[in-house]
């Protein structure tokens, strides 16, 4: 009897010692795997960022090269110098491009609608960064045709679309999670901007300030920096290390000039407001008064009017960088500068609302340059000052760029990088910030946030978290999860995990208090790493993770899911530590769309009531 008792005690002690050794071995194995996985994760992150920088940069370079080729072929001055053509041909060149892009829009209306920077932001906010590759291809060729045949728009919007599309395609191809897709989509957009403008710092801040709407994460920043640097190196190698603008010597004046810079900053904000007012007026004209819905009916009449003015002044053609360079070497009188300033504002608004393909960065730079230049000439003529028009033209570029596009930081860095001159950084900062504040004050939001609201997308920079911030966890709690006690044997755990309804097992003690989660991966790893895995019990494998309370918002659960890469989050009563249920990723998605649908329905009903 005593012998049998001693044997049982011995076996029990051996079992406890073995289980403790297994648990320690398993713990060491998990730590080792964690370190190895973290190293692999960071190396993969760097490698993917480099690949996206190379491909997005190559896409931007190819786009830039084809655009320059098309623009040079169809530029009126080049046509007249190479062949003796009738001026009527020049008149119809913009309409030819409009005819082709309108037909493309007619064939693919849904794809054509997702254009420019705004579509990349929307993809990140509501599609988890996913951009179909056919969209990328469409918006590669359409802007080349549109801008190359004279549309006074810029290459940066299409470039961001191309780079973002490449980043999205690569990360989708690699089957990365949604957070990584968002990160690499923004990195691709920033890399393309970096390549097109030879401005890596501006490319990084463009990704942060515009595409991510200032929602910055550390890994997102590193991806943006790596991709932008790689893209810029590639662009400098392929296109040469040259600046977009050739800036002659200029004089900033003394500190008394800062009062005039301040006045110019306010004028830049007013000019930006004028652009938005005109843009809204033209939009109402097309939609409400004329009720033109076809792309042909909107764009071709605009290009015919543009063609008439183009016969009068070739400086209206295309992107306008050469015109800015000519402005800075004093090729324009005051009246010529004012005339081009007014026409560029009007045609930018017209082409955008008519459905042409291109961005607003380059036209903003051109409008700002003419605004600052004209301001200086007017001040010298009527107030007997002696300020330098070139200096004020440079400062005006930053002011209007920041005002029209709501990007104060990016505008400062972009103008600084494309000019390569540090001297005017202080007045540039002043004009960018003040112009931006004028817009925010009078419009109540940035250009992109207002555009999103116009499309009934009331999702701010935090995406689905903001929408669900007022929805409690208790509204989607599940109580039919698989639960095991702490002392449950390993063999029972295997059978339970195989048939687990939500893929995880939740471990509790005898008082029903939550101890941790066991995943299929944990069980599989225990089998691989240990010959004596059968001696393990549930508490040995349970991983203690943060939980939410029933009254917490669903956004809290989302944060935990993102941080720990979970599909399910336990719901625990903090007062007694008891497990009350779980929240699943699928239920969160369903709740999100339910709330969005309810908001859309409410807005529709309100609009209907107001219409009555």
Task: Explain the meaning of each model-derived region.
Residues 205, 413, 515-523, 580-589:
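Short hydrophobic beta-strand motif reused across regulatory alpha/beta modules
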Residues 484-501, 508, 527-530, 534, ...:
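The conserved cystathionine-beta-synthase
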Residues 456, 469-481, 488, 522, ...:
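Bateman (tandem CBS) regulatory domains
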Residues 1-470, 474-475, 479-480, 484-493, ...:
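Alpha-helical transmembrane segments and immediately membrane-proximal extracytoplasmic
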